[in-house]
């Protein structure tokens, strides 16, 4: 076991704070409509240019192990906010840095860190309650477009495209984003289906950056039972290998020897394959497998129908233009099923919905209907260069996540105004002692941090703008950094999803409060490089 270096109290917190500030300084420049881009060097290919906070945070690894601990903790804030809300990562980082910075000062002044943490928790709970109370439901396609535009850094075409996509496939519909082969960004709605089953092994992953399987024009084998051995499957696997196309295997389960054999073949490059469990349970699973078979112009392989695995031929397999599989879901895009067959299946499900008296059955049938009839909206991102496409794709992903969050929990005034106005929830709120109350005041000050940063990035003085807004009784009034004017944020269409704002504050408060209570830090002592051997037996150059 290697020797450890230990840091205590103020020294430990100072090192943590330095790491937090380094990460915060790199991320905060991206905040707001006039936020700047960050250029990230890649091990291969062109550098990446992005304005996405979490993408910047994920790249930061510091040399000093103690400073790196602080940076990694705040990176966790950005990642968690991204996982839960899909946007607001820069706001979360700025909030976390502000809370920890103020908290570290008070701990250094002799206040109790545990009481400060209790105060921070109380403050965050009160503000979250206020944000939820002020959230307004999204009623129109125009409001969805506004949310998307703000999250895409003011790009109205992206906002409108996402609103159109949601119109076509519904708010809960499947919308995927992929790179186009042209310079234009376009929206396409294709026949498709998504179900909540992910890949059975991470070894099937083809896109390591996004941890997902991407299969182009695959064959699809739909099988009703479990697969424990591949013996019966060998003839059809060999036939698929001859075509050079990938294969998606959907069955009740793939386990043991069968799964191991598929993984080994995938790793060796002999067979491009992925396996997922069939969605649903019991009779519903069977019905959903039949839906998939109809959608992909394949046959469900079932012994009830007298079809055995060893007798399966290529023409019994389904086919689709593209399949995307991540850890939790599978999306089949543009299946080869005939429109008439799909429509007949849809009519059959509609008839079942009318006949059933069970609310539960009706709900599940409607889910199946939505999967078959809704289709999948595909946003194809175009650009002049690969770097431009990747940067635009980041913004579209953010905008898509933000609009979904807005539909879920409503919208609040954007530009940091919702957090600034939520300060009223902390007015008069006190704790059981002075230190707890001081913790509440840390949150009070932190609520100004995002709007100050947005204004600073626009080239103005944050204190002046915050002072002017504090003197206004209009809760929707804010500063439009794009036009450099004071406006009604809701009327101007500058809105944020309530879920994004709430999640950013909760995650920032949680991690920053933990950092404040840190008293000791332990890290490995870096290994000293062994001295290189001297040339010529240590005698130096001999002149020839």
Curated annotation (Swiss-Prot):
Disulfide bonds: none annotated. It holds the Pfam family Cpn60_TCP1. Its main location: cytoplasm. The keyword Nucleotide-binding applies. The keyword Chaperone applies. It is found in: Cytoplasm. It comes from the Bacteria. ATP binds at residues 30-33, 51, 87-91, 415, 496. Keywords: ATP-binding, Chaperone, Cytoplasm, Isomerase, Nucleotide-binding. GO terms for cellular component: cytoplasm. GO terms for molecular function: ATP binding; ATP-dependent protein folding chaperone; isomerase activity; unfolded protein binding. GO terms for biological process: protein refolding. SUPFAM superfamilies: GroEL apical domain-like, GroEL equatorial domain-like, GroEL-intermediate domain like. Its EC number is 5.6.1.7. It catalyses: ATP + H2O + a folded polypeptide = ADP + phosphate + an unfolded polypeptide. Forms a cylinder of 14 subunits composed of two heptameric rings stacked back-to-back. Interacts with the co-chaperonin GroES. Belongs to the chaperonin (HSP60) family. NCBIfam families: GroEL, PRK00013.1, PRK12849.1, PRK12850.1, PRK12851.1. PANTHER family: 60 KDA HEAT SHOCK PROTEIN, MITOCHONDRIAL (PTHR45633). Together with its co-chaperonin GroES, plays an essential role in assisting protein folding. The GroEL-GroES system forms a nano-cage that allows encapsulation of the non-native substrate proteins and provides a physical environment optimized to promote and accelerate protein folding. This is Chaperonin GroEL 2. The gene is groEL2.
């Amino acid at each position: 076991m290697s020797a450890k270096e230990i840091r205590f109290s103020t020294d430990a917190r100072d090192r943590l704070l330095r790491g937090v500030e380094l990460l915060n300084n790199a991320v905060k420049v991206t905040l707001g409509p006039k936020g700047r881009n960050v250029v990230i060097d890649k091990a291969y290919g062109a550098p990446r240019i992005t304005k996405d906070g979490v993408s910047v945070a994920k790249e930061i690894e510091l040399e000093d192990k103690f400073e790196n601990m602080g940076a990694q903790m705040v990176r966790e804030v950005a990642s968690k906010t991204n996982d839960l809300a899909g946007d607001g990562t820069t706001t979360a980082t700025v909030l976390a840095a502000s809370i920890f910075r103020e908290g570290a000062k008070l701990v250094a002044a002799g206040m109790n860190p545990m009481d400060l943490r209790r105060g921070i928790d109380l403050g965050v709970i009160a503000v979250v309650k206020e944000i939820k109370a002020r959230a307004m439901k999204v009623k129109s396609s125009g409001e969805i477009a506004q949310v998307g535009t703000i999250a895409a850094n003011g790009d109205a075409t992206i906002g409108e495209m996402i609103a159109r996509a949601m119109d076509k496939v519904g708010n809960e519909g499947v919308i995927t984003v992929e790179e186009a082969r042209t310079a234009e960004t376009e929206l396409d709605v294709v026949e498709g289906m998504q179900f909540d089953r992910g890949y059975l092994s991470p070894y099937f992953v083809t896109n390591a950056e996004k941890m997902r399987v991407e299969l182009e024009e695959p064959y699809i084998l739909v099988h009703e039972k479990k697969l424990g051995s591949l013996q019966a499957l060998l003839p059809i696997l060999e036939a698929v290998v001859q075509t050079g196309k990938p294969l998606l295997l959907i069955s009740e389960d793939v386990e043991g020897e069968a799964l191991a054999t598929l993984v080994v073949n995938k790793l060796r490059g002999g067979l491009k394959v992925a396996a997922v469990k069939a969605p649903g349970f019991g009779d519903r699973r069977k019905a959903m497998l039949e839906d998939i078979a109809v959608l992909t112009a394949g046959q469900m392989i079932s012994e009830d129908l007298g079809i055995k695995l060893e007798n399966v031929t290529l023409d019994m397999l389904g086919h689709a233009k593209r399949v995307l599989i991540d850890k939790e879901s599978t999306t089949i895009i543009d299946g080869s099923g005939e429109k008439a067959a799909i429509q007949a299946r849809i009519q059959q499900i509609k008839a079942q919905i009318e006949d059933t008296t069970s609310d539960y059955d009706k709900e599940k049938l409607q889910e199946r209907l939505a999967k078959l009839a809704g289709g999948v909206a595909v946003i194809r991102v175009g650009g002049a260069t690969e770097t431009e496409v990747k940067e635009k794709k980041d913004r579209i992903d953010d905008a898509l996540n933000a609009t979904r969050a807005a539909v879920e929990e409503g919208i609040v005034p954007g530009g940091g105004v919702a957090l600034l106005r939520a300060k009223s929830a902390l007015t008069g709120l006190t704790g059981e002692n002075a230190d707890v109350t001081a913790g509440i005041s840390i949150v009070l000050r932190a609520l100004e941090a995002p709007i100050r940063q947005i204004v600073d990035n626009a080239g103005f003085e944050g204190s002046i703008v915050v002072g002017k807004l504090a003197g206004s009784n209009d809760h929707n009034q804010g500063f439009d950094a794009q036009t450099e004017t004071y406006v009604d944020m809701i009327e101007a269409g500058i809105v944020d999803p309530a879920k994004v704002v709430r999640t950013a504050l909760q995650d920032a408060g949680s991690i920053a409060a933990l950092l404040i209570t840190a008293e000791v830090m332990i890290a490995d002592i870096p290994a000293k490089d062994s001295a290189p051997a001297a040339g010529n037996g240590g005698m130096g150059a001999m002149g020839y």
